[in-house]
A protein has these predicted regions:
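A transmembrane-helix-recognition feature enriched in membrane-embedded lipid enzymes
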Residues: 1-59, 110-115
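Short, hinge-like loop/turn segments at secondary-structure boundaries
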Residues: 76, 113-115, 195-198
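Non-catalytic C-terminal accessory region of glycerolipid acyltransferases
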Residues: 4, 129-242
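Short, flexible loop segments at the rims of nucleotide/cofactor-binding pockets, characterized by
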Residues: 49-52, 73-74, 122-126, 155-156
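Short, basic, glycine/proline-bearing loop/turn elements
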Residues: 46, 118-122, 152
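Membrane-embedded segments
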Residues: 80-134
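Conserved H-X4-D acyltransferase segment
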Residues: 6-13, 42-98
Length: 242
């Protein structure tokens, strides 16, 4: 029954919401080059997708974040629905780091660029480092938070080792890095599936880690700490409840 609902109800409405909100966002970008209006529309899009998919999101730990602060957010990534959940329930103006190849896709590439999202070139270590340096400069200059999936993509099982880009950007920009964990989304929409199951997921926020005084030589240790923190945030929900 839930598969038929997903196929005949949720997926068509997701496609419709994406077309409508994407068009509105692109039009809004003609008048607002800051990306703020596009982000507000993306938040509405995220909530719409979760609603038609019958996915509820419970947040924990948002009080740990300064509403006026700038952060580098890092999160685990297990499902396509992670992005709508983060847009809908993380109450910050933030931008994503997105694969450079996405910017070559008609309509999508122009929208990402106008919304202020940052392309990542992974063709070589030098190109990747240049992307990270440019991203750090944008964070420091604009005071806009960014969000990265340091696993480098969706993980079909467990938590993969983190790449150091988030730690590099946070240290270079001199802003705190905040670990996030999304628990339960893999069960509702696993990789390779179009069967969206109804249910609840948890978006849990860890303690922000300050980077003031850290040099780039400390990015490996910061990266290891971020991995441990996200792992622990996930373990809180995986542990048996007494």
């Amino acid at each position: 029954m839930s598969f038929l609902r997903s196929l005949l109800f949720s997926i068509p409405l997701i496609a419709l919401a994406t077309i409508v909100m994407g068009t509105l966002s692109l039009l809004a970008s003609l008048a607002d080059r800051t990306g703020r209006t596009q982000h507000q529309l993306a938040r509405f899009w995220g909530r719409a997708l979760l609603a038609v998919s019958f996915i509820r999101v419970r947040t924990e730990g948002l009080e740990k974040l300064d509403p006026r602060g700038t952060y580098v957010f890092v999160a685990n990534h297990a499902s396509y629905m992670d992005i709508p959940a983060l847009l809908a329930y993380l109450p910050f103006q933030f931008r994503f780091f997105a694969k450079k190849g996405l910017y070559r896709i008609p309509f999508l590439g122009g929208h990402l660029r106008r919304a202020g999202h940052i392309p990542v070139d992974r063709s070589s270590p030098r190109a990747s480092l240049k992307s990270m340096s440019e991203g750090a400069h944008i964070v420091a200059r604009r005071g806009t938070s960014v969000l990265l999936f340091p696993e480098g993509g969706r993980s079909p099982k467990g938590l993969r080792q983190f790449k150091e880009g988030a730690a590099y950007i946070a240290i270079k920009a001199g802003v705190p890095v905040a670990p996030l964990a999304i628990f339960g989304m893999r069960r509702l929409l696993p990789m390779g599936s179009i069967h969206i199951r109804p249910g609840e997921v948890v978006l849990r926020v860890g303690d922000p880690i300050p980077t003031a005084g850290l040099g780039l030589s400390g990015r490996a240790e910061l990266n290891r700490r971020l991995f441990r923190d996200v792992e622990q945030l996930l373990d809180v929900h995986m542990a048996p409840q007494g």
